[in-house]
Design a protein with these regions (language model features):
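Flexible, acidic/Gly-rich N-terminal and inter-domain linker regions that tether
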Residues: 1-88, 97, 363, 373-374
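Accessory C-terminal segments flanking Radical SAM cores
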Residues: 2-12, 305-374
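Mobile, glycine- and charge-enriched loop segments
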Residues: 52-56, 83-86, 100-109, 117, ...
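Conserved alpha-helical substructure of the radical SAM core
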Residues: 65-66, 73-90, 94, 100-101, ...
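Core AdoMet radical
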Residues: 106-126, 137-154, 166-181, 189-209, ...
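Distinct, well-ordered alpha-helical segments
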Residues: 155-162, 182-190, 209-213, 238-241, ...
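Structural recognition of alpha->loop->beta junctions
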Residues: 186-202, 242-255, 327-350
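Conserved C-terminal portion of the radical SAM core fold
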Residues: 211-317, 332-341
Length: 374
């Protein structure tokens, strides 16, 4: 059904007032999903229009979009989308800052430790001495990534593990906000064999210190880039310091479409939201800004790759992972981050007079307010 925006608003105002333990009836679920489809179709149409304006837009086997240098496109992303997946390794349970877009916002003091001397790989805990056993039994991944909070809180613990995976010839990339990085620690990571480092430049609001650390990292690590959620704050801060950032000669910029969970969604209260394939909930402006960013990069011929790490990309990522794991046709772990749909977060976009559905039809008989039997 092509529900009208007016009818969708009436229903979602009702849904947002329901007690948390009250489940919608089948016909109400149809209305909910019809509304999500209408919003998503309008967002997809806008994105298609923006992409049509990027002259040299490229794809990686239709799994993601990027502009710029093919050689500088991050191999960590190739592994994630074409290889064995992200293959996350976790160690640190602390961070030196708190970002409003962080998935752990508000709970940073309550993150459980991995364990003294231990590393979490594939949801299993290992001592460093166990890694040789792991490599001798399991098929080697195409790449691994050091994720979760801030590794430079205890970066000295990482060097020997990085060296071990480097000796095994496995591609490795690491995420950091870059604030605590030093020339000494970046050099040590490079000497240990880290292939790629990604700075969340948005976390520091594009601070001069982190920009300088990006430049230093280029001296020691093969591939250096930025990966940060695309927000209006990052977009503005980046272009205020664009030349200084590009002068670091970084290799890539991954613009992640911001998606929200129960920890951080209140930080974006009142923003226009959409839900992608009944999964990730995102502000509508995040990918819009990414595509505008990519258009500028393409027109100005920046000597790097700019990658659109969108909800579409993450959907493709999870399909690739399930196929590599030998799961059934269509299997994927992609899904919603919320245990219950937060209907109220869709009220702003339904109330926005400037946001239009592409096609609207009258509700069928039996679906109009007052016609459903409770």
């Amino acid at each position: 059904m092509k529900i009208s925006k007016k009818d969708a608003l009436i229903w979602f105002e009702f849904f947002s007032m329901l007690p948390e333990d009250e489940e919608p009836m089948t016909k109400q679920q149809e209305i909910i999903y019809a509304t999500f489809a209408q919003i998503e179709a309008a967002i997809d149409h806008r994105n298609d229009m923006l992409m049509s304006e990027i002259n040299n837009l490229k794809t990686l086997s239709n799994r993601t979009f990027y502009v710029g240098s093919d050689i500088k496109f991050p191999n960590g992303c190739r592994s994630c989308l074409m290889g064995t997946g992200l293959s996350a390794i976790r160690k640190t349970n602390k961070c030196n800052i708190e970002c409003k877009f962080c998935y752990n916002y508000g709970e940073l003091d309550f993150i459980p430790p991995i364990g003294e001397g231990m590393w979490q790989i594939g949801e299993t805990k290992f001592y460093e001495k166990d890694i040789d056993l792991l490599l001798s039994i399991h098929k080697k991944p195409t790449g691994i990534s050091y994720v979760y909070l801030e590794p430079f809180m205890e970066i000295e613990k990482y060097y020997s593990v990085v060296k071990k995976f480097s000796d095994a010839k496995i591609h490795q990339h690491l995420y950091t906000n870059g604030i605590l990085a030093t020339e000494e620690s970046l050099k040590a990571l490079g000497e240990a064999g880290l292939d790629e480092i990604r700075f969340n430049l948005g976390a520091s609001k594009c601070s001069d210190k982190v920009i300088e650390n990006i430049k230093i990292a280029k001296k020691y690590i093969k591939k250096v880039g930025i990966e940060t959620p695309m927000t209006p704050e990052f977009f503005e801060a980046f272009f205020n310091k664009k030349q200084a950032i590009l002068d670091t000669e970084l290799d890539f910029i991954n613009c992640a479409e911001l998606h929200l969970n129960e920890n951080n969604i209140d930080n974006y209260y009142g923003e226009n939201m959409y839900i992608s394939r009944h999964g990730y909930i995102s502000p509508t402006w995040s990918r819009e800004l990414t595509l505008k960013f990519m258009k500028i990069a393409d027109e100005e011929n920046w000597d790097l790759a700019v990658h659109d790490c969108s909800n579409h990309t993450k959907f493709a990522r999870d399909l690739n992972l399930s196929s590599k794991e030998g799961k059934w046709f269509g299997a994927s772990s992609y899904g919603c981050e919320f245990s219950k749909i937060p209907y109220e977060v869709f009220l702003p976009i339904l109330r926005d007079e400037n946001f239009k559905f592409l096609i609207e039809e009258e509700l069928p008989s039996g679906y109009r307010p007052g016609e459903l039997v409770f």
